[in-house]
Amino acid sequence: MAEKRRGSPCSMLSLKAHAFSVEALIGAEKQQQLQKKRRKLATEEAAGAVEDAGCSRSGGAGEHGCSEADEEAAAPPPAAGAASGPARSCADAERSCGSRGAAGSCEDGFLQGASPLASPGGSPKGSPVPGLARPGTPLPAPQAPRVDLQGAELWKRFHEIGTEMIITKAGRRMFPAMRVKISGLDPHQQYYIAMDIVPVDNKRYRYVYHSSKWMVAGNADSPVPPRVYIHPDSPASGETWMRQVISFDKLKLTNNELDDQGHIILHSMHKYQPRVHVIRKDCGDDLSPIKPVPSGEGVKAFSFPETVFTTVTAYQNQQITRLKIDRNPFAKGFRDSGRNRMGLEALVESYAFWRPSLRTLTFEDIPGIPKQGNTSSSALLQGTGNAVPATHPHLLSGSSCSSPAFHLGPNTSQLCSLTPADYSACARSGLALNRYSTSLAETYSRLTNQSSETFAPPRTPSYVSVSSNPSVNMSMGGTDGDTFSCPQTSLSMQISGMSPQLQYIMPSPSGNAFAANQTHQSSYNTFRLHSPCALYGYNFSTSPKLAASPEKIVSSQGSFLGSSPSGTMTDRQMLPPVEGVHLLSSGGQQSFFDSRTLGSLTLPSSQVSAHMV
């Protein structure tokens, strides 16, 4: 009877183990029915409910009973030997369940669990083994945030030289500015993006000019109050941050420790490094511009070695200065090529609407123009083989490489001109004169006549066309139309490749502005004739002292105001009187030529310099 009592618990456990092994081969529903039947059978074979309960409560007694039963059954039948393996698993399961408490809980946990000795061929459909294995598999780790510096090449160029950042009391923006691109954020999570600037070391620096290097000058100054720049778009979703370039261009640096504008406070002559912080919203409750960045699992900091800079109140390295001027769009005023020029011309040309469209014409490279004070000028003027009489030495001779010049007779106030035949073909490139059948030399005697007759040119245009060199010609063609009398004189000069126009100054008809005995203030009229039919004029006054001396006017005035095609006053240089095209006269006022629009014009006694602009 005692053996039966001792063996009954183990037999019950072996039956349970056998039921467990069957569970791996049959469906869950059939296995549950089989378990119920075997439970009823086990309760009938048991001696009493008290002994069964005691065995189930005391895991140690059950273990010893089970093990003793296994030892006594040294030579069991083959079926019993086959069940020995599940019996060991049962014992192991009861050891684990013994610490849990009641027998029912242990039994349920054992029945619902998966046996490690299940068939190696795999469990069939509906087996709980795969279902229990799925929750145990590790989930893929979320992608870590990543920050990329934008404009890294420019930062590296500055870093190679030694980046410097200006700091002021009012605050100065950084250049280059911190611009980053963030990836790896949760699109649906809210984030703060912030930036602070921390010291690189505890040293103070100075710049050595002869070696162009920064050297340690001592220990750093006392720490400044911490400041954090929170991006204005914070907080925002990860999707918003990842689809844009995050710029900190509005961040300002200051050396004012009492600053209340939210600027980053730094010491001058110290090295600092910016840091970009990515902070989850649930971790950014303590985020403040005047407090350090909170630390925690949801806070990530990123820094870049090429963004290290030295704070200065004025740039020390000239290479840094030039690089910032060249690359900073807000420093374009320092890139003006004319910033070192002086005078009115630099001031006028700094504005686009004041700039003239054409340059002043000079005759420095034309060998036919005589120089003042030259003793051999008479020989140059008195050429042979020309239609120009020697009695008029003011006219140029037909040298092989000279260009036409236009003058007025000294006693007639008439326009004198040379025919293109007087100027032979020149070997200089670009100087091509078109010969016309109507020669201007035929009109020379009429121009030098003392009578005050009106010169009417032929209907066909008889002007000289010049290809590229700065030779000038006069437009003599005209059409029928009403003529009018003009108190000033104008010439129509044409230069190939430029707008055909002549600008010069003529005194007013009230009197000779160059007379020595004139005491009142005279006025000068500036004309520009745009061939064929556009006339512009401006009037400006001169002082009596300058009017008394024509040489003084020419020598003292380095420039005069002239008209531009847009109608504005421009600053142009005045040539010496003998280097320009002159209009000379000493006689009375005479009508001397017709133009297409001016008709009959009169010329007062004067000496002026004409300039092409």
Curated annotation (Swiss-Prot):
PROSITE patterns: TBOX_1 (PS01283), TBOX_2 (PS01264), TBOX_3 (PS50252). InterPro entries: p53-like_TF_DNA-bd_sf (IPR008967), T-box_DNA-bd (IPR046360), T-box_sf (IPR036960), TF_T-box (IPR001699), TF_T-box_CS (IPR018186). One of its GO terms (biological process) is positive regulation of epithelial cell proliferation. SMART domains: TBOX. Residues 37-94, 114-145 are annotated as: Disordered. Residues 114-132 have a biased composition (Low complexity). One of its GO terms (cellular component) is RNA polymerase II transcription repressor complex. The keyword Transmembrane does not apply. Residues 149-336 bind DNA. It comes from the Eukaryota. Gene3D superfamilies: Transcription factor, T-box. A motif (Nuclear localization signal) lies at residues 36-40. A motif (Engrailed homology 1 repressor) lies at residues 18-28. Keywords: Developmental protein, DNA-binding, Nucleus, Repressor, Transcription, Transcription regulation. It is found in: Nucleus. One of its GO terms (molecular function) is DNA-binding transcription repressor activity, RNA polymerase II-specific. Disruption phenotype: Deficient mice fail to maintain anterior-posterior polarity, resulting in abnormal dorsal-ventral polarity of the somites. Mutant mice display neonatal lethality and abnormal morphology of vertebrae, ribs, spinal nerves and coronary vessels. Besides, mutant mice develop anomalies of the urinary tract, including hydroureter and hydronephrosis. Pfam families: T-box. Acts as a transcriptional repressor involved in developmental processes of a variety of tissues and organs, including the heart, the coronary vessels, the ureter, and the vertebral column. Required for embryonic development of the sino atrial node (SAN) head area. Homodimer. Can form a heterodimer with TBX15. Interacts with GATA4 and NKX2-5. Interacts (via engrailed homology 1 repressor motif) with TLE3; this interaction represses TBX18 transcriptional activity. Interacts with PAX3. Interacts with SIX1. This is T-box transcription factor TBX18.
